[in-house]
Curated annotation (Swiss-Prot):
It comes from Macaca fuscata fuscata. Residues 26-125 form the Ig-like V-type domain. A lipid is attached at residues 419, 422 (S-palmitoyl cysteine). Palmitoylation and association with LCK contribute to the enrichment of CD4 in lipid rafts. Residues 419-458 are cytoplasmic. Forms disulfide-linked homodimers at the cell surface. Interacts with LCK. Interacts with PTK2/FAK1. Binds to P4HB/PDI. Interacts with IL16; this interaction induces a CD4-dependent signaling in lymphocytes. Interacts (via Ig-like V-type domain) with MHCII alpha chain (via alpha-2 domain) and beta chain (via beta-2 domain); this interaction increases the affinity of TCR for peptide-MHCII. CD4 oligomerization via Ig-like C2-type 2 and 3 domains appears to be required for stable binding to MHCII and adhesion between T cells and APCs. Its main location: membrane. Residues 126-203, 204-317, 318-374 form the Ig-like C2-type domain. Integral membrane glycoprotein that plays an essential role in the immune response and serves multiple functions in responses against both external and internal offenses. In T-cells, functions primarily as a coreceptor for MHC class II molecule:peptide complex. The antigens presented by class II peptides are derived from extracellular proteins while class I peptides are derived from cytosolic proteins. Interacts simultaneously with the T-cell receptor (TCR) and the MHC class II presented by antigen presenting cells (APCs). Keywords: Adaptive immunity, Cell membrane, Disulfide bond, Glycoprotein, Immunity, Immunoglobulin domain, Lipoprotein, Membrane, Palmitate, Phosphoprotein, Repeat, Signal, Transmembrane, Transmembrane helix. Glycans are attached at residues 42, 296, 325. GO terms for molecular function: coreceptor activity; MHC class II protein complex binding. This is T-cell surface glycoprotein CD4.
Amino acid sequence: MNRGIPFRHLLLVLQLALLPAVTQGKKVVLGKKGDTVELTCNASQKKNTQFHWKNSNQIKILGIQGSFLTKGPSKLSDRADSRKSLWDQGCFSMIIKNLKIEDSDTYICEVENKKEEVELLVFGLTANSDTHLLEGQSLTLTLESPPGSSPSVKCRSPGGKNIQGGRTISVPQLERQDSGTWTCTVSQDQKTVEFKIDIVVLAFQKASSTVYKKEGEQVEFSFPLAFTLEKLTGSGELWWQAERASSSKSWITFDLKNKEVSVKRVTQDPKLQMGKKLPLHLTLPQALPQYAGSGNLTLALEAKTGKLHQEVNLVVMRAAQFQENLTCEVWGPTSPKLTLSLKLENKGATVSKQAKAVWVLNPEAGMWQCLLSDSGQVLLESNIKVVPTWPTPVQPMALIVLGGVAGLLLFTGLGIFFCVRCRHRRRQAERMSQIKRLLSEKKTCQCPHRFQKTCSPI
């Protein structure tokens, strides 16, 4: 009796000692669906020896017979292999290609009368829909995992956005910065496996852009895409809402086929010009106040639901002098924070306001600058020269004209003076002649009268 007790205790101790050894010998390996995994098995001696790989059902997968690799009747027979070049080093690993979720199992390596267990867990991460999505659409990632596993998933977008979840991860309202390679890490039993998923967000590089131009300048609108596709087919249109117009109108419609652009219809006023290749490019011959406003370019891609959008704004500046008034105006969508100012060159601003028009009465002569600024940064500038009322110095042509006018006035004055003088002399001569005649007549008349008086009888 007493001899049996120590024996039972010894047997129990041996069982307890053996159990942890089996657990410690079991390794966990994570694999990716469609990828290749290598399950290692090493002998204590670096030499070629007999080995066998089996699954949990004790079905032989592969092994060695003599110096040749043999395969069993398992489902992995056409996808399993071993590195023969490493057998002499005591390495008898099994390589499984094109992994499937159902390959998840416990695999047993028998070598040197010992067994090594490796638990393989295969995961797959896929996008539920196409990986080419329009901006604003939702992305859903689904994790495929073997039964009985409880993995966690953490994904990071190219823009630094972190998203965590279980077997399903949803990303609403994709943005253009989400385009690129997403890195997702699957964790299970303190082991990790990393997935790389390329997501293409179909969008323009900019959601909105503003073009600032002086009146009369040529305007260039550009709409570069934030993605590249080998075959790109679709159609587009530019709608424009001028600031002075009551409603918007279509300026141009076009087709896009294999990156070639062809215009379908264009307005006559204004008559836009469009480039024939990507990026989408429009030219407005002249920036005029009646064109200032905002537009919306839409692009519908073939086999895609929804459209790409980009807003574009045009701000036009005019600096003009009318009589004694110098005016600076802008048309188009501007922020209330923008400042419009008029200043004489190399001097401080004469007038500066958060308004769309400023003016100066009786401006000094010189070069004036009309400036549209945002927090000190000049967005648009137009120069206008103010000419003085009396130019200094007087130009030679002006001297000639003034001399001619003065000479003409002097000649006219002298002519009038001499004419008046001549006429006065002539009239004076006539009067003297008349007086002489009268005096002459009086003398001839007195003699007869005196004679008659003297000779008359008493």
